[in-house]
Amino acid sequence: MRLCDRDIIKALDEGSIVIEPRPDNSVISGVSVDLRLGNSFRVFQGHPAPYLDLSSSKADLSKVIESVMSEEILVDDGKPFFIHPGELVLGVTKESVTLPDNLVGWLDGRSSLARLGLMVHVTAHRIDPGWSGGIVLEFLNGGKLPIALSPGMTIGAINFETMSGSADRPYNKRDNAKYKDQTSAVGSRISGEN
């Protein structure tokens, strides 16, 4: 069951859901909380390899990922960051979100942005129970024109769903959790998987 606005506000007040900085109640709709774009980005750079071989050794895969991923790009609030047609860019929410072990979060991009060709969260929209940190966004510009985004703008919304019980292995207690406590646009750590 998804939490309604009243239950979201109650969970924020009681501290079972933590969003920092705490959102104003005006950005809590009937079923979700608006999230804003943060200041950290990473882009994919050109690479001489014809493809990314996910079956290669962990060391080789890690080396290739590091070579195609830019260093962190920090953009000041209100300044534009351009995403060009066909470009995949990582960003992060301005807010840090912490969930208890009995709630799962779901992140959706804004419909108004999708109608311009911008996919805000390409596939990984589930926020696991026990999650704590910024939420990395996988932007893809499927439109025909570059799109200028500005840190601080509303980029999406998160809603919360109660589970049938508390998770035995929430994200914050898993030894193999690759993105614990992230605060910036962290690139793929697929080479760290078993």
UniProtKB/Swiss-Prot annotation:
GO MF entries: dCTP deaminase activity; nucleotide binding
Enzyme superclass (EC): hydrolase
GO BP, one annotated term: dUTP biosynthetic process
Ranges of compositional bias, category Polar residues: 182-194
Active site: E138
UniProt biased composition (Basic and acidic residues): 170-181
Swiss-Prot/TrEMBL keywords: Hydrolase, Nucleotide metabolism, Nucleotide-binding
EC number: 3.5.4.13
Binding of dCTP, residues: R110, S111, S112, L113, A114, R115, D128, V136, L137, E138, Y171, K178, Q182
Gene3D superfamilies per the UniProt record, alphabetical: 2.70.40.10
Pathway listed: Pyrimidine metabolism; dUMP biosynthesis; dUMP from dCTP (dUTP route): step 1/2
Region feature Disordered, mapped onto this chain: 169-194
Reactions accelerated catalytically: dCTP + H2O + H(+) = dUTP + NH4(+)
Assembly mode: Homotrimer.
Protein function: Catalyzes the deamination of dCTP to dUTP.
Family: Belongs to the dCTP deaminase family.
Name of the protein in question: dCTP deaminase
